[in-house]
Design a protein with these regions (language model features):
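Short, low-complexity, charge-dense intrinsically disordered segments
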Residues: 10-19, 28-33, 41
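Intrinsically disordered, low-complexity segments enriched in proline/serine/threonine
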Residues: 20-21, 164
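Leucine-biased recognition of intrinsically disordered, low-complexity hydrophobic segments
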Residues: 24-26
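Nucleotidyltransferase catalytic core that binds NTPs
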Residues: 32-211
Length: 211
């Protein structure tokens, strides 16, 4: 690449199937973004060589079931939220911190790459599910991450049966996927407004405009 600050290679903008050097730049961009945000807010994120703690946060559906049973025995209040989290930004982090404040344990359902494509089209996600999960696992507010392939987290919500289901945006609680599952078990649904001016689409458009 001729310019570290743009997504161009030989004056060509790659929107789909970028060359490996562009992919590596995107990954590094994401890592630097998260680390700088964390430092600015007084958090410590270890560099990759130190990040042995992250793997244990990423669980399979079977593993989350075992973990939930353990937390229930400890009378922990479980919170669940979900999303794509493609190009992590400060709005995501604030949202997750707010969600974590509703209980003791925050379980994050992360849309897989195939799930994101179904929801947002063939040009997404920008970051792979492995990269997204790795970066999210460095956020202290998140206790565990489960990647799911479906378009909605309905099956995962049934497995976790959270005390609090959190959704970002301007939904009515009863319109949120999992509402019936949670409320029938005595739980509740919380709606957290999005942070104005913070979005993955906005970041991508800004980068392309400057390239």
């Amino acid at each position: 690449m001729q310019d570290k600050d743009c997504f161009t290679t030989e004056n060509t903008i790659y929107i789909h199937d970028p060359p490996r050097e562009v992919e590596l730049f995107l990954i590094r961009f994401q890592q630097v973004y998260v680390i700088r945000y964390a430092k600015a807010n007084g958090h410590k994120i270890p560099m990759p060589a130190e990040q042995t703690f992250t793997d244990h946060k990423i669980l399979s559906l079977e593993e989350i079931g075992n973990r939930v049973r353990s937390w229930r025995k400890e009378s922990r209040k479980l919170v669940f939220t979900n999303g794509c989290f493609d190009i992590l930004h400060s709005g995501h982090v604030r949202y997750l911190q707010t969600a974590a404040g509703f209980g003791d344990i925050l379980v994050l359902g992360l849309n897989s790459d195939s799930s994101v494509r179904k929801l947002k089209g063939p040009l997404r996600p920008i970051m792979t599910q492995a990269d997204r999960a790795y970066l999210l696992s460095a956020i202290e507010a998140i206790d565990c991450i489960v990647i799911f392939d479906e378009e909605t987290p309905a099956r995962l919500i049934q497995s976790v049966s959270p005390d609090v289901l959190v959704k970002g945006g301007d939904y009515l609680p009863e319109d949120v996927v999992g509402y019936d599952t949670v409320t029938e078990n005595g739980g509740c649904v919380k709606i957290v407004p999005y942070v104005e001016g913070k979005s993955t689409s906005g970041i991508v458009n800004s980068i392309l405009e400057q390239s």
